[in-house]
Amino acid sequence: MDTRKIIQNVIEYIDENIKSEISNYDLCNITGYSYIHLVRLFKQYLGATPNEYMLRRRLLFAVYEMNGEISKTDIAFNFGFDTYAGFYKAFKREFGCSPSKFTKSYAGNKPYKINILQEEHIMVSKTKIQKILPNLNLQNSVVKPIINENTGKQSENSYYIGDDYVMKYSTNLAAIKKNIMLLEIVKLNNNDDYLQCGELYFIVAKRIYGNQLRCVDILNDTSIALTIGENIAKLHNKLKFYDIDDFEQSNIYDDCINNLDKVKKLANLSNEFCDKYKNEFGNLIDKLPTQLIHRDINPSNMIFAGKEFKSFVDFDLSEVNLRIFDICYCATAILSECFNNQVDYKIWEKIINNLIEGYNRIDKLSEYEIKVIPYVIYSIEIVCIAYFSKYDKFEELTKTNISMLKWLIENV
């Protein structure tokens, strides 16, 4: 049997028996491997030992259950901790905050399924990050997880290093090089921009002080969208000076046409909608300006200090695409974060209109760009549905985006 399938069996066994005592013998019995060999494979595929991985999963499942009516002490005991105090210490050590602060501050989502057969999924432990820090003379800094302030999910590719820096890592050197070009990077001791460690590449950037934009804030004060629109335009003006040959060239229309039949079946789209999409968007696509864009302007990638905009972050996905894409993606990302709370269309419409108005204050959008906005928004959802539907861990996101696409078709 393929090694990955064997490790996937262990991953599923751990989740299915998360409240039971799981011994090293049990895991070795499932795999037929020695524990030393199993540890090596776990580190290779998941970036952690089996015991480290099990502890993290127990903590995540336990804090998820704390949204219910069962007492914290009982939940801690059910997940293998002798006392709540022991659970508390383990949780704070792993996530950098107390369980109560976590459940109060972040959405209580069930831990998603991890399937290494479907996609690369590398969990880099804080211990490994700590070992890298001497390369930057930051060995005395505390490594802390970065938590999405809207979803409560931990970042899968970055950590805070002390209070002043952010470390990012990836197996994709191209993504790392984009950030080197667009962020303020801290050089290594040998003056290199990034560190290669096995298949992973690491960089450290100076932290932007402030907080991720919270969807509740922009829903309560849609004028924030004016500020965002202005700063998207300012970012685009800066990005015009970069050589587009250094970045991927993308065509959102072609991407959607390639996925439309699949999404049509998944979302039960009408022939009328699909034909109109192909004809009207197809006739406009060549009239739209393209340039280097951010590509991932979602609330967690916008840093604010109160109402003052500080910066966009995370340029992993930057590419050459439609200029209007960033505005449309920002609007759909905000909608996605609050969609299950039955957002009022009039509020969301005000947000997207303010994004456009803010952008126009700095750089005028063309008549064709304004006309094509609904189709770019539909396109973003079509691409998201096609992507998310491939992975188990995004099952709920697939359903949400299908509902969003239908809602958008009806309203926009």
Enumerate the language-model features and the residues they cover.
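Conserved NTP-binding catalytic cores of kinases and kinase-like/nucleotidyltransferase enzymes
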Residues: Q118-N190
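ATP-binding pocket architecture of kinase catalytic cores
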Residues: G162-Y242
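Sequence-specific DNA-binding recognition helix
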Residues: S23-T31, Y35-F42, G68-T103
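ATP/Mg2+ or Mg2+-diphosphate-binding catalytic cores
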Residues: V383-V412
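Active-site activation/catalytic loop segments of kinase-like enzymes and analogous catalytic loops
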Residues: I324-D363, Y378-F394
